[in-house]
Amino acid sequence: MSNDFLFTSESVSEGHPDKVADQISDAILDAILAQDKYARVAAETLCNTGLVVLAGEITTTANVDYIHVARETIKRIGYDNTEYGIDYKGCAVLVAYDKQSPDIAQGVDRASDDYLNQGAGDQGLMFGYACDETPELMPFPIYYAHRLVERQSQLRRDGRLPWLRPDAKSQVTVRYVDGKPHSVDTVVLSTQHAPEMSQEAIREAVIEEIIKPVLPSHMLAETKYLVNPTGRFVIGGPQGDCGLTGRKIIVDTYGGAAPHGGGAFSGKDPSKVDRSAAYAARYVAKNVVAAGLARQCQVQVSYAIGVARPINITVYTEGTGVIPDEQIAKLVQEHFDLRPKGIVQMLDLLRPVYEKTAAYGHFGREEPEFSWEATDKVLLLREAAGLAGEPAKAFA
């Protein structure tokens, strides 16, 4: 790719139907983990007009009222009126959970010599990424796409824009010059709204109250704004589209700036490497960049079902590393335990912290529960790489 280019990422609000499904799945996971931290959970959700279906595989000693958890999640998001797309009070909730297959369980539970040799819950490949485009070490387009829909939710909830409804989407196109974010080329923001609102009033409020307070002002000189470009967005949420768990995997990660192994996160307990290893790969990549070993870092790990140790740990820095990629990969293997149980232990993942991850991105958020965002390996990595002193600030 040339060093001068346009790149686009999108995000969706907590009220988007797929995100409603993700949040219900993770709320159920949290409710189970609060009682049984060793539960096996694969909770899938479908939500449509007036209907929520809970299905998947759960093996647990916990006693959870799944229907109540689903309704409370829908209520928290803001769907308390059928006119908005679904009403938590009146929607039907169907429960169809089974137990985890014993064929899968035996591979995960089997340990050859110690606790840390629990096998992976499935085969697969996972990616982690970090770069110095933002202080949070996330790609600029996805970071700000998240902040836009987060702002939409804030203004809806605090009543400053009372005509906003829960469903919304954002898209940010950034112009890169010399490989760095230079300016915002285009912003698309579509938001569900009350039927009496005019397009002109919506456009003005969205630009002035949502977009401009979020994006860096010096990057907006020639920005094109597309607000509700269809002209009307009254029907939304699960009424506008059927929502399913796991359909926003690029929104959940890096907005297309890094590859994705294909496995979704929400509703899965941390024995599933789709989730836990992707979190660990982000932790590795962020520490590599924060340590000043590279300006960007992509980490790939892969697993075989029932086998504890990763098949591969591969690091790419796209020529930005101060030491060879192979040397960074060796440091990663020495200082990060990427066996499934090692990850759970390293990141303290047996906690009910997952519902918060299910909207506005799993990465690049300085939430106290997000242990995978810590940069506590920086000095260790620098010392092991033979670099003296504290790293320079990664974000330029």
UniProtKB/Swiss-Prot annotation:
Its EC number is 2.5.1.6. ATP binds at residues 16, 167-169, 232-233, 241, 247-248, 264, 268. The keyword Heme does not apply. One of its GO terms (molecular function) is methionine adenosyltransferase activity. Gene3D superfamilies: 3.30.300.10. CDD domains: S-AdoMet_synt. One of its GO terms (cellular component) is cytoplasm. K(+) binds at residue 44. It comes from the Bacteria. It is an enzyme of class 2 (transferase). One of its GO terms (biological process) is one-carbon metabolic process. Its cofactor is Mg(2+); K(+). Binds 2 divalent ions per subunit. It is found in: Cytoplasm. Residues 100-110 are annotated as: Flexible loop. Homotetramer; dimer of dimers. Catalyzes the formation of S-adenosylmethionine (AdoMet) from methionine and ATP. The overall synthetic reaction is composed of two sequential steps, AdoMet formation and the subsequent tripolyphosphate hydrolysis which occurs prior to release of AdoMet from the enzyme. This is S-adenosylmethionine synthase. It comes from Ralstonia pickettii (strain 12J). The gene is metK.
